[in-house]
Amino acid sequence: MTENPITKYIGNFIDELSLAGVTEAVICPGSRSTPLAILAASHPDINVHIHVDERSAAFFAMGMAKAMRKPVALICTSGTAAANFYPAVIEAHYSRIPLMILTADRPHELREVGAPQAIDQQFLFGNFVKFFTDSALPDSHPDMLAYIRSLAARAAGEAKKAPRGPVHINFPLREPLMPNLEDEPFQRLRSGSHVTVESGRFRADRHELVALSALIKETEKGVIVCGELQDDDAKEHIVALSQAAEYPILADPLSNLRNGTHSKETIIDAYDSLLKEEQLKRELMPELVIRFGAMPVSKPLFQLLKQNPSIRQIVVDPDGGWRDPTQLSAHMLHCTEEEIAVLADSAVNSENRTGNWLEKWRFANSRFRALLRNLEAEDLTFEGNIYRNLQHLIPDNSSVFVGNSMPIRDADTFFENQERTFRIFANRGANGIDGVVSTALGIYAATKEPVTLVIGDLSFYHDLNGLLVSKTLDIPLTVVLVNNDGGGIFSFLPQSAEERYFELLFGTPTGLEFEHAAKLYGGRYICPESSAHFADAYLSSVNRRGLDIIEVKTKRDDRVEQHRRMLDSALHEIRKEWPF
């Protein structure tokens, strides 16, 4: 029998991926991708996850890679299958998430000739991938096996190299497609990796760091702004700098600085609300801002930075990117957070510090939180109360995935500092409302710890297909569904003033009964009517297997007025009590 070159060619590729640290593969069923799927599934060091919907599968893989911070392989057949990966590829690009996209394709002689299920897959994802190549046709010659191993190592290295991101390899494959597993598909050309790819991170010039240290010494009114971070280790360095410089940290919920066992003495969790009040904004106006991580969710913070060019902004990015939507940053420092933290010991000049600056922020923050705690939390029709109740129930060592639009903004407003050790995630690269369910399920597949998904009704509808893997892969998920029957965020925007067209074009109520979704995917459904009922339902869910949908029905018409009344009341009291 003639040897099929596909076996050793694809087998060597898959084996080299495993040596490069790829341990997980998400596979979408298809014929042309048969060798990729079978050889990934048969490799002893790769776990496979089967997902029949390509769009959901891509977000699922991205969720795994997001939690693990290492590449996950994503495999599909030829044709429009790969096009369904596109939204997740875009999100992975902007969120700096490493993905290995492996698409099967027709061989060259069947391209652009009207062959079935054949589209142009060259550079399909454009500039949203860090690396693309159309692999050579399978060949078992030793030179070609060395080539395909080198390609696997290179692609995995590119995905992991700063800034992390997706890569795409397209495989033209001729029939017969079935590999011969008796043919030693993973036989190595040499012991260990064929080639090891090592990449470091950027380091700052020593003179730049000395200049920054001097700037911190001479500037009392400084703040540290912290968005979503690429690595958890960065948190301790940022906290150390904050304490030494006596600068408050304006911590986005995705920084995960609000939760954890580290010191919270300098962490401000209510800055988004505080900066909405003009008098407080004047009192808390910084002269220096040091930014770490992605840009925070907060619009008032962005407006403060954008509208006050006299504020000196320094952006620290260890991945060498350009995260400055204000276009006003004075310095872009491409170095690690640890390098900045070495400034901590020399940053303080106590003679120039009055103590009032940090105390102003801490006073405003603590009073805002105290005033909010005194407000009635029983009425679940006010969406803020969902978050106020939920934050005290989330189990340690679990994950919370927060949907875009209103959920992430409400989490920013209502999630406060606490000693709990859960992690908060969201898809804030492109800020889309698609693929959120699947990303959350991918987080569980990577961590094997409880996952709570907080999501709005439109975003949930967008990715209902994703719930299937909760059933087929036995993935538990607690969904807190905040249902205001439409696009709640638009009620806060100028579009809400145009009553004739608001509901038609922006409110877009669907009237869906999500209890049927729970039945369709084998889950449990409950619609609590009180905070106590909500707590019971939630705690029961996170302590058992399976899918639970906890739907909280809220009133979109009332929420804007309730939200503003709550904020105005709290901010008014802070102004009255202001002691500085």
Curated annotation (Swiss-Prot):
Family under the similarity heading: Belongs to the TPP enzyme family. MenD subfamily.
Function summary: Catalyzes the thiamine diphosphate-dependent decarboxylation of 2-oxoglutarate and the subsequent addition of the resulting succinic semialdehyde-thiamine pyrophosphate anion to isochorismate to yield 2-succinyl-5-enolpyruvyl-6-hydroxy-3-cyclohexene-1-carboxylate (SEPHCHC).
A GO molecular-function annotation: thiamine pyrophosphate binding
Cofactor note: Binds 1 thiamine pyrophosphate per subunit.
InterPro entries, sorted: DHS-like_NAD/FAD-binding_dom, MenaQ_synth_MenD, MenD_middle, THDP-binding, Thiamin_PyroP_enz_TPP-bd_dom, TPP_enzyme_TPP-bd
GO biological process: menaquinone biosynthetic process
Keyword annotations: Magnesium, Manganese, Menaquinone biosynthesis, Metal-binding, Thiamine pyrophosphate, Transferase
Organism: Bacillus licheniformis (strain ATCC 14580 / DSM 13 / JCM 2505 / CCUG 7422 / NBRC 12200 / NCIMB 9375 / NCTC 10341 / NRRL NRS-1264 / Gibson 46)
Enzyme Commission designation: 2.2.1.9
Pathway: Quinol/quinone metabolism; 1,4-dihydroxy-2-naphthoate biosynthesis; 1,4-dihydroxy-2-naphthoate from chorismate: step 2/7; Quinol/quinone metabolism; menaquinone biosynthesis
Name of the featured protein: 2-succinyl-5-enolpyruvyl-6-hydroxy-3-cyclohexene-1-carboxylate synthase
Keyword Metal-binding: yes
Catalytic activity: isochorismate + 2-oxoglutarate + H(+) = 5-enolpyruvoyl-6-hydroxy-2-succinyl-cyclohex-3-ene-1-carboxylate + CO2
Cofactor: Mg(2+); Mn(2+); thiamine diphosphate
Subunit structure, interactors included: Homodimer.
HAMAP family listed in its UniProt record: MenD
